């Protein structure tokens, strides 16, 4: 009689894509640094500025010019349009560790860009032919020439009474319309996010601006800059969008926050609805599973792990069932 235990079979031969999953929800996000437990100290996120834009190849420049013409026509006809805001392109980055304590460090080099270039490049990657030509063999630990025209911050806001806020993005925004998202998602903007010591952007200034414009939360009244914690860095491979994920605990209750949004905030059009959810792994996972499409998995995962530990978050993934469609 053979008493040997049956050996496990080989894993599926299909190669894993290496992307983050929020429990049962697969995503196109690749985590490049951070696990939710470690934090970036403010002095360890360093930004630099190269004051010269990259010149687009002819095919991309033609695409950008077409977008500009379309948006100008829409404006003239009284139709929804996108204005050409000044933004930053990420030229390159370096992930390292601080020598004495091995704290996470991130160095970022930026160039000037604009929103129409972003639409013509990153947001056009949904077209298979363009994607195949420029992203057929990509190393996500390197920036992609001409397709790095955005850098953002994504924050889970935690209220004084233990809630977090989810949003449903507006119908007429340029990226991910009507998707369910985290509390604050903001892209670096020139020159308003410029640091105090030069033209390089300050990611904390961007985070503060996003909280003010999208939720009506203001520094020194509702939170301090020291309350903003960045926990991870990565890239959404669908559109080659890179950014930082983090969390912030505010001094305002959920009822006061929702009331302020109802009464009016600067960029209310960016979100069509807010949702208040108790900030626990079980409640957050349940909301994510029942509201699709759901974008902010990496942001919420890092925030939950930082607050409750990885084991409880993974237990919530196992215990909360996906709704039947």
Can you say where each PLM-predicted feature lies in the sequence?
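N-terminal leader/linker segments that precede catalytic domains of diphosphate-processing enzymes
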Residues: 1-209, 217-325
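Juxtacatalytic substrate-recognition/specificity segment
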Residues: 212
């Amino acid at each position: 009689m053979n008493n040997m235990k049956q050996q496990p079979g080989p894993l599926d031969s299909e190669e894993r894509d290496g992307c983050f999953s929020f429990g049962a929800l697969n995503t196109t996000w690749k985590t490049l640094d951070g696990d939710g437990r470690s934090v970036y100290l403010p002095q360890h996120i360093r930004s630099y500025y190269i004051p010269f834009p990259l010149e687009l190849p002819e095919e991309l420049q033609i695409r950008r010019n077409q977008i500009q013409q379309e948006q100008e026509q829409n404006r003239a006809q009284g139709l929804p349009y996108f204005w050409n805001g000044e933004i930053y392109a990420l030229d390159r980055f370096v992930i390292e560790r601080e020598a004495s304590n091995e704290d996470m460090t991130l160095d970022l080099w930026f160039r000037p860009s604009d929103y129409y270039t972003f639409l013509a490049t990153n947001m056009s990657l949904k077209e298979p032919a363009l994607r195949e030509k420029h992203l057929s063999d990509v190393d996500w630990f390197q920036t992609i020439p001409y397709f790095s025209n955005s850098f953002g911050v994504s924050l889970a806001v935690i209220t004084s009474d233990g809630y977090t806020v989810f949003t449903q993005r507006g119908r007429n925004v340029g990226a991910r319309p009507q998707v369910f998202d985290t509390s604050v998602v903001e892209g670096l903007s020139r020159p308003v996010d410029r640091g105090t010591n030069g033209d390089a952007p300050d990611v904390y200034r961007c985070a503060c601006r996003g909280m003010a414009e999208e939720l009506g939360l203001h520094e020194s009244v509702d939170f301090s800059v020291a309350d903003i914690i960045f926990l991870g860095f990565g890239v959404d491979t669908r559109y080659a969008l890179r950014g930082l994920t983090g969390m912030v605990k505010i001094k305002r209750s959920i009822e006061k926050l929702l009331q302020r949004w109802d009464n009016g905030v600067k960029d209310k059009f960016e979100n069509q609805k807010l949702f208040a959810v108790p900030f626990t792994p079980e409640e957050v996972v349940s909301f994510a599973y029942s509201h699709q499409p759901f974008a902010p998995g990496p942001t919420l995962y890092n925030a939950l792990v930082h607050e409750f530990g990885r084991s409880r978050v993974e237990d919530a993934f196992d215990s909360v069932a996906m709704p039947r469609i």
